[in-house]
Amino acid sequence: MTETIATIKEKLASLADPHDARLLTWRQDKRCGVQKAIALWEKRLALARKKQADFNQRFNFERDYWLKGVELVAGVDEVGRGPLAGPVVAAAVILPHDFNIVDVIDSKQVAQHKREQLYEIILDQAVSIGIGSVDAKTIDEINIYEAARQAMTEAINNLAPQPQALLIDAMQVYLDITQQSLIKGDARSNSIGAASIVAKVIRDKMMTDYDKVYPGYDFAQNAGYGTKKHLAGIDKLGVTPIHRRSFQPVHDAIVNKKNC
């Protein structure tokens, strides 16, 4: 009995072996729907292989250390340099050597719902995770660059066990630990990518909580960035304790209020 096209599509959906004997039979099936289904399956397989290869390549920096006997390598990243409000948050993540969640990459390349799923997986599988944050008042006092460094340092210090080497996204920290600063590291290292996801999800949750404390600025949606609704909130309600007064739009709002 000839298989229906729907049945073949269903079987292809769960097929991962390109040498499966059924493929030979299906490729000889002259029905257009079957050939389209096989072409789509081949495309999906090629994309999955590329995704796996890219993921494997993003472990190159970690693997260099592992091969030298350096087992505990932490990826470090921060989020929240650009917003007008809220803290800068950093995460440090040590991944196990057999970690194989290929979707882990720079948090900016991952949709929110997917980030939250990956966050839970990383929490479950990581050897260790450390978090650090620096509030708006301190950002104003020491500048955002130094605040990011301070948050990263705090995150690293909160790791247990402590790392033997660090892979850091575009930063050096003042710690006596072997470290590499990688430009766009969150897209080049799985450990840094994992750290960026953890930091992003945690900071977004913090800003959602702040939205309840300080309504009218749309913090739950803009995460403190200078959107139209956020700027309108500043114009109407003034600045909050979590606003960064050294950042231009906020500083201007304070000056304008004093001059009125």
UniProtKB/Swiss-Prot annotation:
Q: Which UniProt keywords are given for this protein, alphabetically ordered?
A: Cytoplasm, Endonuclease, Hydrolase, Manganese, Metal-binding, Nuclease
Q: Which residues form the RNase H type-2 domain?
A: 71-259
Q: Give the cofactor binding note.
A: Manganese or magnesium. Binds 1 divalent metal ion per monomer in the absence of substrate. May bind a second metal ion after substrate binding.
Quick one: which residues bind a divalent metal cation?
77-78, 169
Task: Quote the cellular component terms of the Gene Ontology held in the record.
Answer: cytoplasm; ribonuclease H2 complex
Question: What GO MF terms are annotated?
Answer: manganese ion binding; RNA binding; RNA-DNA hybrid ribonuclease activity
Q: Which reaction does it catalyse?
A: Endonucleolytic cleavage to 5'-phosphomonoester
User: What does the UniProt entry say about where the protein is found?
Assistant: Cytoplasm
Listed name of the protein: Ribonuclease HII
Top-down, what is the taxonomic lineage of the species of origin? Bacteria, Bacillati, Bacillota, Bacilli, Lactobacillales
